[in-house]
């Protein structure tokens, strides 16, 4: 079983990976946009991680408002990367993503919305299909004035729904470079201001559980979730 705390970010360079380790992370999910996916780029990042005993896993974020394009991209990248995210915001995309157990994380469901992007029905779907909801701390930091308060309200609302319906939640730094990297304690401290400490601990550990689940499904003896070949 995979243990530790893992960040979700867009950091691929050697200095950034060393900074993540120095800040106290056990590993990270390095995420590329699906339109810019490069196997060489992620392999290089994984190698940087191995050189400093830091675990780097591959991720792709699918960003499109077209549902058919999104579903095609999910099929294309599901077996190429460890973690699959889909950018939310559009209510139809939010719902469809939470119906798909091939997707790991619904990223920023509140993006460009006046509401939080989720309701009790969608939260239940996420719980049923093991699709996590992302709190992107980087987006919160980069926003200003009313936009920041709106995102913070969306976080609080989505946390309330997710806790009630046992929907997985992850928090990410969303860092693009060393200047956006945050220590685990910083993210945990923020979570403690919007949720109780036990729930905050659960959230900070969820990313590693998602990675562990996907690694389990890649085992050759696993035919599908809950069904595997047992050798006598």
Swiss-Prot record:
CC terms in the record's Gene Ontology section: cytoplasm; ribonuclease P complex
Biological processes annotated in GO: tRNA 5'-leader removal
Record keywords: Cytoplasm, Endonuclease, Hydrolase, Nuclease, tRNA processing
Compartmental location: Cytoplasm
The EC number(s) this enzyme carries: 3.1.26.5
Catalyses which reaction(s): Endonucleolytic cleavage of RNA, removing 5'-extranucleotides from tRNA precursor
Temperature note: Optimum temperature is 36-38 degrees Celsius in the absence of L7Ae, 48-50 degrees Celsius in presence of L7Ae.
Molecular function terms, GO-annotated: ribonuclease P activity
Predominant cellular place of this UniProt entry's protein: cytoplasm
InterPro entries: Pol/histidinol_Pase-like (IPR016195), RNase_P_comp-3_arc (IPR023539), RNase_P_p30 (IPR002738)
The family this protein is said to belong to: Belongs to the eukaryotic/archaeal RNase P protein component 3 family.
UniProt function note: Part of ribonuclease P, a protein complex that generates mature tRNA molecules by cleaving their 5'-ends.
Oligomeric and partner information: Consists of a catalytic RNA component and at least 5 protein subunits.
Protein name: Ribonuclease P protein component 3
Organism for this UniProt entry: Methanococcus maripaludis (strain DSM 14266 / JCM 13030 / NBRC 101832 / S2 / LL)
Gene name in the database record: rnp3
